[in-house]
Design a protein with these regions (language model features):
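N-terminal glycine-/serine-/threonine-rich phosphate-binding loop
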Residues: 1-40, 301-339
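Ligand-binding pocket scaffold of soluble enzyme catalytic domains
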Residues: 8, 112, 138-141, 162, ...
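Active-site-proximal beta-strand/loop segments in catalytic clefts of secreted hydrolases
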Residues: 12, 45, 88-90, 149-150, ...
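CN hydrolase (nitrilase-like) catalytic-core segments centered on the catalytic cysteine
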Residues: 66-86, 153-261, 367-389, 454-551
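Active-site catalytic loop in hydrolytic enzyme cores
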Residues: 76, 94-195, 199, 253-259, ...
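Short beta-strand scaffold segments in enzyme catalytic cores
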Residues: 87-89, 101-105, 136, 232-234, ...
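C-terminal beta-strand edge segments of enzyme domains
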Residues: 203, 207, 212-306, 437, ...
């Protein structure tokens, strides 16, 4: 394992219409970082050209081949200082005349390889072709490096697939504009992707060096100006952010000199608990992730619903069923006192019994599918006139399951879900074999439980199955995930310091309102909340405290608003299902092994065909 090494995230600001000058300036900053001892240096997206051109024709003279003039100049620095550089380049392919938004990796012996951006935003599609490199991983002395570019982070796959392929470290290449809340409705077209890139590390156990621009770019031929967000950051593979630059001040000018963030990456952390969860994936459940369900999906909700969503938290004490019922009922009474509205109320995991400590205790508290827990939840649903979700230990044909139940306002059971990605402590439980989504009068509802949230494939399937709302009873004690480390100043609404990063990520990458209910006491860290589809500039999430019983509610309209930068329909349309196939393959299959073990991104295992 290599020793900790110095890294640099460079907030470099290229100039429009100045390709040669941009190479000189980018090389000067790269030389400075390399001379300071940085072994990995990351520069922003389109770093040699600038970005907001009028059209492809105006952009073309400032594009470069990869490898090309830019990588050749950087290679001299890498050779001189024994370092690696990841840089964003607007690429022209001379063989085809196709143009790509590309990340290039250069090392001590020269050009190593490229990644062509897959997650194209509404500007990218004006002049770039979707990437055709997959998500390659490059083996270096610093670890296995992958590149992710800006809007890619709208999706969970761009980090997950490299992680499954063995990546250790992300070079995140970005030109992310910041939210201008004073613009009102116009701000809703703004995505500010660098604002919350934590999911890329937190879900996959990868280190990351993330670079953005931090200035204003103005195109005098269009009058368009964009303020880039700054907020370069450095992340360890165990999920900690160990370096961070501030968000840009919106009054900065074109002449802002940029900045360099230095820090260290510790390769000893490449082996970590979250990366170990890759061995617990359930590819046999993920088949629909390879389905492209756009532009039309007849399973998707045809209309939106104005509803109230609520998360309930209270002390759930093992062995105190009557007390748990009483504490849950106290919260139900507070909700009954409020004006009635359609909606859904989510209770913590093991709603009435508490979590069993061992198999004997699990067997003792197990119930039938319509046992006491479901009966009490049915009573709550009728009294609240809302859908209700809770969970219990279910006994069925001699097996035990951790089961979530969705109960309708009339008290009938709409559906149930057996936890598919079991917490390691649940040795008594059998795993479920489906990730269902249920049609209801308030839209389509998906269910997850506890450590399911550590697996983006699980919420990914619910998104592909077009869940409008995801309800998650949990018993979270802080052993995984952790607090969301946002970039202050890039959100229209701030986040509570105890916002759980994975719950936020589920909502963001599934584009489904996500309602999580956790217990308090006995090590549980509360923080129940409603996590919104568009937290950057439209809706603030609501999060409960760590210790206190209570409820948190939010009035929402399912499916979001048509003028938002993203919704589930757009998310599904933007997915690269052709590249996502490996998440669905059995890990002992020939196609998976060929993809995992072959350099680059070998898709021949599922694309090769001869008549």
């Amino acid at each position: 394992m290599p020793a900790p090494f110095k890294v640099a995230a460079v907030e470099f600001n290229p100039e429009l219409f100045e390709f040669e000058r941009n190479i000189e300036r980018a090389c000067a900053l790269t030389e400075e970082a390399a001379a300071s001892g940085a072994r990995l240096i990351v520069l922003p997206e389109a770093a040699l050209s600038g970005y907001i051109y009028r059209d492809r024709a105006q952009f073309l003279p400032y594009m470069d081949t990869v490898p090309g003039k830019g990588t050749e100049a950087i290679a001299e620095i890498c050779a001189r200082h024994n370092c690696y550089v990841a840089i964003g380049i607007a690429e022209i392919d001379p063989a085809t005349d196709l143009t790509y938004n590309t990340g290039a990796l250069v090392g001590p012996v020269g050009y190593i390889g490229k990644y062509r951006k897959n997650g194209l935003n509404s500007s990218d599609i004006m002049w770039f072709t979707p990437g055709n490199t997959g998500y390659p991983v490059f083996d270096t002395e610093l670890g296995k490096i992958c590149m992710i570019i800006c809007y890619d982070d709208t999706y969970w796959e761009p980090a997950r697939l490299p992680a499954i392929k063995g990546a250790d470290l992300i070079a995140y290449i970005c030109s992310s504009d910041r939210v201008l809340t004073q613009l009102g409705a116009e701000a809703k077209g703004n995505h500010s992707t660098i604002a919350a890139v934590q999911q890329l590390c937190a879900w996959n156990g990868l280190a990351m060096v993330a670079a953005d621009r931090n200035n204003v770019e103005t195109n005098p031929t269009t009058g368009l100006s964009v303020i880039y967000g700054g907020s370069a950051s450095i992340w360890q593979a165990d999920g900690r952010r160990t370096g961070h630059l501030p968000a840009t001040d919106q009054n900065l000018t074109l002449n802002n000199p940029g900045a360099v963030l230095y820090g260290e990456i510790d390769p000893a952390l490449y082996v970590n608990d979250q990366k170990a969860t890759l061995q617990r994936r359930r590819p046999e459940l993920y088949g629909e992730l390879a389905f492209y369900r756009a532009p039309t999906d007849t399973k998707a909700s045809a209309q939106s619903h104005a509803i109230t969503v609520t998360a309930v938290q209270y002390a759930v004490v093992a062995g105190d069923t009557d007390g748990n019922i009483g504490r849950a009922n106290e919260q139900v009474l507070t909700l009954q006192d409020r004006a009635g509205a359609d909606g859904i109320v989510v209770f913590p995991a093991f709603t009435l019994t508490g979590a069993p400590a061992d198999p004997d205790e699990a067997a003792a508290i197990a119930e039938s599918g319509l046992g006491r827990t479901v009966q009490v939840l049915s009573d709550f649903a009728v009294r609240l006139h809302r859908f209700v979700v809770g969970s219990h230990v279910e006994r069925d044909n001699g097996a035990l399951f951790h089961t979530a139940v969705l109960v309708a306002p009339d008290g009938t059971v709409t559906g149930s879900y057996r936890q598919t990605h079991l917490d390691p402590a649940y040795s008594w439980a059998s795993a479920g074999d489906d990730l269902p989504v249920f049609d209801t009068s308030i839209g389509r509802v998906g269910l997850l439980l506890c450590e399911d949230v550590r697996f983006p494939e699980a919420s990914g399937v619910l998104a592909v199955r077009r869940a409008d709302v995801i309800a998650i009873p949990t018993r979270w004690d802080g052993r995984y995930g952790g607090a969301l480390q946002e970039s202050k100043g890039l959100f229209a609404h701030g986040f509570a310091p105890n916002t759980m990063c994975l719950w936020y990520a589920v909502a963001k990458t599934s584009q489904a309102y996500t309602v999580v209910a956790n217990a308090v006491g006995d090590g549980c860290q509360g923080s129940s909340g409603v996590f919104t589809m568009n937290p950057v500039d439209a809706e603030a999430p609501v999060v409960a405290g760590i210790d206190d019983a209570g409820t948190v509610s939010l009035d929402i309209t399912t499916r979001g608003q048509p003028d938002w930068w993203m919704d589930q329909r757009r998310l599904i349309a933007g997915r690269r299902t052709d590249l996502a196939v490996p998440v669905t393959l059995g890990t002992d299959s020939a196609a998976f092994l060929r993809w995992r073990d072959t350099p680059g991104y070998d898709m021949s295992g599922w694309t090769a065909y001869s008549q």
